[in-house]
Amino acid sequence: MADSQTAPLEPITAADGTPLKKKLAQALFRSRVRAVSLVVPLFAFVMASFVIPIIALMWQGVYNDRFSSHMPNLTEQLTMWDGLTEPNEKMYEALVADLKTARADRTIGRAATRVNQESPGTRSLFTSTARKAKKLKPPFKESVVKANKKWGNIEVWQAMKITSQDLTPGFYATALDGRYTVDQGFVRQDEKRQIYVKLFWRTMLISATVMGLCLLLGYPVAYLLATLPLRTSNLLMIMVLLPFWTSLLVRTTAWIAILQSQGVINDLMVFVGITADDARFSLIYNMTGTIIAMTHILLPFMILPLYSVMKTIPPSYMRAARSLGATPTMAFIKVYMPQTIPGIGAGGLLVFILAIGYYITPALVGGQDGQLISNMIAYHMQKSLNWSLAAALGGILLAGVLVLYWAYDKVIGIDNMKLG
């Protein structure tokens, strides 16, 4: 019997002769490309509307070339200066040359504004000297100081040296109630100029208070929604969602009418006899008004995450605890409440993050005591036009949000977050 030899297996091919394995790989690649192509528009939108603006915000807080771009000669001399010795003749000569050029180009105001941000009161010094720059003759140090004695103050030159640096920590130092100096680095501002840290703490306090009130008011409502019959709970859910159908501005303005001294609440308390007509409570244009209005506006953001978690808790757990001898209160605390922690965490995180960034409500009802850091950011963006300081304040606020997000992930876990 002849030895039989096994012939090698031929690879399985498609109709066109291409190996089937290669065909499958090509089909899988095409399906992946189609899947990715569907995500590309969303990715581009997120990058353009979220990631890139945040990166630009962070960059704006540490980069400002307004002085160096308009005063190039002086910037070069300031780079070589140690910041401690008296300014030399070359520095004054560069100052005069740049003042002439900046006045001719009508850009002196931009450079002066940048120095004024570091050393208030120097803008007029720049503009007044720029008008006399053509008449200044050598020796420039003597003629410039003669034109305005403030140029002999070394602190003015130190401020210019700091502003001549495009990359600077000065705005973040200001946002933390400090200032950046040539010789000492970061130092605290004078007591009367320390406003931002207090605003940060006030923002945190109000946000935490609003979060606590929303939890205190929202937990029973969410419990009712989760335990009542479907028909009744749907009606209550409509009441919870009703504020979303009304403009935020309208809701905030309504609280002004309710809380003002001649408003509904004060009139009712006078009518009942709780307070005298000449001793009405001040409930608006202060921290109290801010807390009340923000609690009302943010309450649904606490109720919905709580409701979504409570709805998944089987009622049999409570019945089992009762059957084992637990009182209703003990069963609720020991069995039911621990299962709602993901909802408490999600609602608390959502309300707190929304509260620390709120602007329109504190602006309308807050007055002087109820202003938050967001109002100061808006001020620097719209009125003082110090965008770099606004970016630094926003960057610190963003860092605080990221810390909260990290803490939530460590304590509860992002995987357990339920928002609805």
Task: Go through each PLM region and give its residues.
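Membrane-interfacial helix termini and adjacent extracytoplasmic/periplasmic loops
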Residues: 21-28, 251-295, 365-368
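Amphipathic cytosolic juxtamembrane alpha-helices at the membrane-cytosol interface
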Residues: 27-28, 32, 233, 287-289, ...
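Membrane-cytosol interface at the C-terminal ends of specific transmembrane alpha-helices
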Residues: 284-322
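C-terminal transmembrane helix and the adjacent membrane-cytosol boundary/short C-terminal tail
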Residues: 307-318, 322, 391-420
